[in-house]
Structure formats: C-alpha cells, structure tokens
C-alpha cells in the first residue's frame, strides 16, 4: 500500500499531514490532500513533492468515488457527520478508513459489511476520543495483569490556553471548535458514583462542578461529560463502582458560563427573529423580562443573582455582552450569536500557545489493600498552527495510518484502539513527540 487520501485540511490536520509527508520518502507513499478550499489544502502541502492538493466537495459523489478508487487508505478529517458518507464509499470499494471521531451509529452499522470485505474502519484515534482510550486501557490492563480489581475511574480532559498566554478574565480561549464549546453538556449527564447512578440535567450542570489540583498548573474545575457509563463496556470494567469522565476549565469559568445557560442563550434549536439587527445588549435583553425602569444590567442581576458577584459580572462585561454593538448575523440561533460574540474576544492571538491537560485517576484493590493511581498528561503547543490540540489529534491518527499501511494492523470492521497491539505502539511513539503521561501511585 502506498497511496493515502486525506479529506479535510483544517486546523487539526497540520501534524497529521506533516508526519505522513515526512515519512513518505522512506515508505514510498504518495499523499493526496482534498479540501473545499484548495488554498487550505495547498497550504498544508507546502509544495512537498510527495503529495498533491485538490479542491474536494464531499457532496460530489463522483469525485468521492474517484478519489477513494485512487487510494489504498483514506483519512477523513471532515466534520464528524460526514464520516459515514466516506465510510460507505470506502467499504463499497474495499478501502481502509481512519478518523479521529467517535464511532457513530451510522459508522457502527457498517461493521459487518466492512469485516466481510476485509476493510478496517479505524475510529477514535485523536486525543479525546483516542489518547484517552489508549492511555486508560494501558492502565486498566496493567492493573488487571497484576491481579488488581478496579473500583473507580475518573478521567478529565481540557483544551485550554497556556498560562503564559492567559490574559483575560475567563482564563480561557478557543483552542478548538468554538461551536462544541458553546453547546457542551446539553442533554442529561449520567455517571456512576460509589455504586449509585447520578443524573444532572443541563440547567444544573455548571453548578455541579468539582475541583482538582494538577501540578504545576494549579486548580481546575471539572464538569461531568454526558454519558460516562458506556465506557464500562468498552473498557471491560462492568462491575466498577465509580466512573466519571469530565471536562476541565480554570476555576471560575463555570459560574460565569452558567449565566448564559440559565438565561437560555446557549439554545441552538430555533432562530431569533431579526437576528441580523440585534446588538449585543439587545440580544442579552431578549432573555430578560420587560421593565422600562431597570437597566439591562439591573435586570440581569435580579433574574440571575450569580451575576451580582463582581468577578462573574466583570467576566460578562469584558465579553462585551452589554455593548450597543451590532452582532451582524442573520437567521441565527441564540447559540450562534453567543458564539460570534465570544469568538471576537476569546480567539487565539498570533503569539498564543495552548495547553492540553488529561488526567486519569484509578482506584483499585490488590491483596486486600486499596490504591490510587494517577496518570497525567500536560502538553503545551508550539504556536497557533502547531497547537497541542493539533498534535494530539493528528499524530496518533498518523501513527495508526502508518501501522495500517505497513501491515501491522490486521483488525477489520469498525476498530477502536483499545487493544495492546494497537495502543502500545501508538503511545510509545507519541512519547517521541513529547506526548507522555506521568504516573504516580499511593496506598489509600
């Protein structure tokens, strides 16, 4: 196998493409990079003679068919909802596919046909999902192999701004897809704690935070992710008493964000009338009761008492939410308008660096004694292109592609990297790129 097709040349593809182009001469690979923006694809290629850039439209079925026909292995860096379109074509033509995204129901439905045709559909090969699975499974297998019984598992991940570039009152900047941040946590959160099922509705999520100290970076708050329980079966820990997966933010973020949640400003289910004419102040006022004798600020603090807190109020004020400035978005949902406002203030600046933090905490029993084992990854990005997020999404995906191209992966059908023959080589090589977990253990 020598021909690799990469569909999508967005932010997350930087390290993936650089890795594959860097290894192309040694392995005799040719790489085609397609994106709706030819400029983006050509920019990622950078004139490298081992690749070609082209304009790609996922909705052009003939083009997709022709490109998949050319390839031995395809890698989809397109938005997750587009992966099944690529996957179906790959299965039809008997070509392997890799993605960094969660296994959707549509992807799962292709498992039997893919396996029959000898096709690998490798998914969840990024950071979250991806490195989280691989590093957790390495710890789980290690504890099991010495006879331990796992009783608790808490796994937290955060994509944040590096401390040296943290210069706003939210202690946060968008290092990844802003839309996902605005919509985070919607639905009901479900986890298991000390044998009890716990449910947190969206309107209470950001007031149900926990704090963790992660040296040398200090204190973080965590809000739980939506469905932690599905990982019991995936990881083979069905009898576990506690399993919680969460998202990390700097302390103080959740209380301020909760103001928007309580008002309904993160709703993405409807369009606001005349949204193109709304100022930021009018947008906020749309969610407050009519009272001609009160200012918007006064109404907000009456309706949402938390906004009376000076620190929270200053966060909101810094965002510009009280300004008489036009947002300028037609036919937009509240979530889209809020995202636009936040992107103006929380985008990465030219010299910014991000930081990725991931921590697993396992409680287990061995020989009648109780232990706790922590495994922590902290990685600071190089710049706004070679971010920690791009490195941890793209590099494991690239390593997996190399393994598949060189015959080291014999799994077929829908595959996740939760077996030692997959996660060990990927995690070991990631350490060469600075993606390394530090472990500590203590007896309880």
Language-model region placement:
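Glycine-rich Rossmann-fold phosphate-binding loop(s) that bind the pyrophosphate
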Residues: 9-10
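N-terminal Rossmann-fold NAD(P) dinucleotide-binding loop
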Residues: 13-14
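NAD(P)-binding Rossmann-fold cofactor-contacting core
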Residues: 28-45
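Rossmann-fold cofactor-recognition segment
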Residues: 48-60
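ADP-ribose/adenylate-binding Rossmann-like module
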Residues: 89-107
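C-terminal catalytic/substrate-binding lobe primarily of soluble NAD(P)-dependent oxidoreductases
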Residues: 142-444
